[in-house]
Amino acid sequence: MKLTCVVIVAVLLLTACQLITADDSRGTQKHRSLRSTTKVSKAADCIEAGNYCGPTVMKLCCGFCSPYSKICMNYPKN
């Protein structure tokens, strides 16, 4: 019974801390447009499927690099 009360109090305390932190940080992100453009440019900077992706290539594949043929491949669709 004592352990249950301690767990309940701990969960309530952690929930309250998260809510306080979420309210406090609202609207404080600066340079929002700059951050989104860097994410897009990083996502588009990859090797397309069918191209060589060996150890001398500096870019990553958009999908995955086949370990045997060293050719970029798309992920299979389920």
Curated annotation (Swiss-Prot):
Omega-conotoxins act at presynaptic membranes, they bind and block voltage-gated calcium channels (Cav). Residues 23-42 form a propeptide. Disulfide bonds join C46-C62, C53-C65, C61-C72. Keywords: Calcium channel impairing toxin, Disulfide bond, Ion channel impairing toxin, Knottin, Neurotoxin, Presynaptic neurotoxin, Secreted, Signal, Toxin, Voltage-gated calcium channel impairing toxin. Belongs to the conotoxin O1 superfamily. The keyword Transit peptide does not apply. Residues 1-22 form the signal peptide. This is Omega-conotoxin-like 2. It is found in: Secreted. GO terms for cellular component: extracellular region; host cell presynaptic membrane. InterPro entries: Conotoxin, Conotoxin_omega-typ_CS. Its main location: secreted. One of its GO terms (molecular function) is ion channel inhibitor activity.
